């Protein structure tokens, strides 16, 4: 299982709609948080080991209405 975080900039006034769409339409998105800073949202996504991260981001996340820009972070290890 691969864990990635996708930071998203949204069109003005669209962050809540983008968050709702990400949770409802993209199966791999497990959490969406509104954040401060350069980006509006942070999405936590779980992908299969075989999944291509680039294709997932460009085809499933960047195509959501209201997404203006993304930045992807790949997690190496989760600590508990």
How should these model regions be labeled?
Residues 1-80:
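A compositional/biophysical signature of low hydrophobicity enriched in polar/charged and small residues
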